[in-house]
Amino acid sequence: MKNSGISWTDHTFNPWMGCSWRSPACDNCYAATLAKRRYGIAWGPDKPRHRTSEATWKQPLAWNRAIEESGGPNERVFCISMGDIFDAEVEGGWRDEVFELINKTRRLNWLLLTKRAREAVEYAKKIVWPDNAWIGVSVEDQAHAYRAEIIKAIPAPVRFLSMEPLLEPVKVKLDGIDWVIAGGESGENYRFLPKAWVLDIQSQCREANVPFFFKQWSSFTSDALGHELNGEVCHAFPTPKNRKAALDTEVVAAK
């Protein structure tokens, strides 16, 4: 059963909380504000990351078991909304434990979204990449479109881009990319998202035959302006690919 308020996933799993600024998409980080307000946790490069409870860590096992018992389709898990899975300041063993959990929950498709593309590739070099782990990067502006190129080295069944908040027009090379999510920013200091920018991303996806998911417009509250684009709900999802488990060293060498 879906337990996440994020429209492109079924579940959200946070093995820890805490992060630090990485790029302009982080400027109005909702997670940092929520962590401080609700849990008294301060974020930053010199701040500790806080591991969540054992009960939280057991949730994916329960979700996986429920799917096995019901015989339903695989469900998506976003990991993590309150930090970054490839944050270098996270205790190394915690990340290893997450990947052990991924391998134990074969009925879950794990959406690993990061702003640390190079760190993701470095970690991928050390492991056999799970075939139920999707890899995604944030691409909020043209200066960070390079992240999309870096993750093409990882043999994930789905490689995706999160272009939310979309801060300017962006041109991306979508070969080797399987899914694009785009959207505007919400909250008190949201940055305006022009419709033309979204339509351009949608057009690039159509030309490349890449599924496009439009999440929301920019507004004070996330649902104030809805999520229709020209009267249409654009909620397309990707079909996972059967990619080889080894890292693409040619792509790595080119970065």
Model-predicted regions and their roles:
Residues 56-211, 223:
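Conserved AdoMet/S-adenosylmethionine-binding subsite of the radical SAM
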Residues 1-76, 84:
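N-terminal [4Fe-4S]-dependent radical SAM core
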Residues 1-17, 38-41, 167, 171-255:
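Auxiliary Fe-S-binding modules of radical SAM enzymes
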